[in-house]
From Swiss-Prot:
Name used for this protein in its record: Peptidyl-tRNA hydrolase
Cellular component annotations (GO), alphabetically ordered: cytoplasm
Function: Hydrolyzes ribosome-free peptidyl-tRNAs (with 1 or more amino acids incorporated), which drop off the ribosome during protein synthesis, or as a result of ribosome stalling. Catalyzes the release of premature peptidyl moieties from peptidyl-tRNA molecules trapped in stalled 50S ribosomal subunits, and thus maintains levels of free tRNAs and 50S ribosomes.
Active-site residue numbers: 18 (proton acceptor)
Database matches in InterPro entries: Pept_tRNA_hydro, Pept_tRNA_hydro_CS, Pept_tRNA_hydro_sf
GO molecular function, one term: tRNA binding
Subunit composition and interactions: Monomer.
Amino acid sequence: MVVVGLGNPGPRYAFTRHNVGFLFLDFLKSKDWKTEKYFAWSRIKLAGNDVALVKPLTYMNLSGLAMPHVLKFFNASPDDIIVVYDDVSLKLGRIRIRKKGSDGGHNGMKSIIQALGTQEIKRIRVGIGDKPEGMDLVDFVLGEFSDEEWIILNKVFEVMKEALEVILIEGTEKAMSIYNSLEVRV
């Protein structure tokens, strides 16, 4: 399995809502990352399996540019990939696991679907909450989590790690049935 977390490179974006994919991978493994031309990567053991972690080094909207290089490097196919990214339409504390689907308006996922030529890509969408009324969407997704939101997010990351283990052991359908209805609260 190759877990691809989406985000924007650089310290300016490091802790923003839009970088929740990168943040999750850092939760799984905070050090010992290696860098290729188009992506950073590391490996972990999860449920007894070797799992590659990948952060595209392009900006979010160009995430797909890294994907052919990721597939070649890991000798993988689109079926081996699970993409983790933010979803403004999901409440903070919720995740949505899917086996396939459209980009749902997410430009990073849109770029990956275009690059791989298929919508049949597993994904975990991570709720980042509703933007406050009157706030620009870009300002919201490029804003940082509050201290209270971090408490929830760290619990969400624990749940997501469990969900990945279920995907590895029992399959995506089983993980969907367990985790898509859960809501993490403080």
